[in-house]
Amino acid sequence: MSNFTDFNVLERDGRFHLYYTDKAEEIGKADVIILPGTKSTIADLQAIYANGVAEAVVKAFRKKKKVIGICGGDQMMGVRIEDPGQVEGMQTVTDGLGLLPLVTVMQDTKVVCQSHFRFKNYESDCAGYQIHMGTTTPLHAGERQTTLNTLADGTTDGYRLNADCWGSYMHGILDNPVVLDDLAAGFGVAAGSGFDYRAFKERQYDLLAGQVRKAVDLDYIYSTLYL
């Protein structure tokens, strides 16, 4: 698992009780299952097949539990992962969980960028970032897909199977209140009643900046930089 910070907001939002697990028996107890990012998608996918977690996730999906994937988790949710250049290992084709009609092709070029987007059909402006290897496309070429995120430049990210199952390359997607409200929908919780994590982070940055100003001679640093 990588990018633990994707889930910090869930630890602070009172609507959710977050727990991490690699045990199959714990998966079925959850109302929402999130497959996180990883630096070794294929190896970790093989690991969850071996320990029974993959089967438990598929069973939860069939029981209409909410299942979402972020980055590597999104790749796992597809039909298969192809690695013709053996970027991640010797295996060139690995079966995915089959929850989303997608195919991922691993590449040795890494995508790294910040993104502004709109989630589903909501009007709220959202922010996140991408850091991944590989491209993910519909299983059948030319197939119309239901886009999850529409980026500011008009490009798209992610796939939405229905209200309860989607995947995205977007890290930080849960930091956006509209996404958390959507995630909590159906559980009898009022929208907008959660924790504003983005505002919380800004306050923490301001506090940190204040401490740095107290401890560091910024005027001297600026003078040496000719600012």
Can you describe what each PLM-predicted range is?
Residues 36, 128-132, 166-170:
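Active-site-proximal beta-strand elements of phosphoester/diester hydrolases
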Residues 1, 25-26, 39-41, 74-75, ...:
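Short, glycine-/Ser/Thr-/acidic-enriched flexible segments
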Residues 1-3, 7-14, 19-32, 57-64:
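Catalytic cores of nucleotide-enabled group-transfer and carboxylate-activating enzymes in metabolic
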Residues 119-163:
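Catalytic beta-strand/loop cores that center a nucleophilic Ser/Cys/Thr
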Residues 38-127:
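Cysteine-nucleophile active-site neighborhood
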Residues 20-21, 81-84, 111-119, 146, ...:
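Glycine-rich, charged/polar anion/phosphate-binding loops
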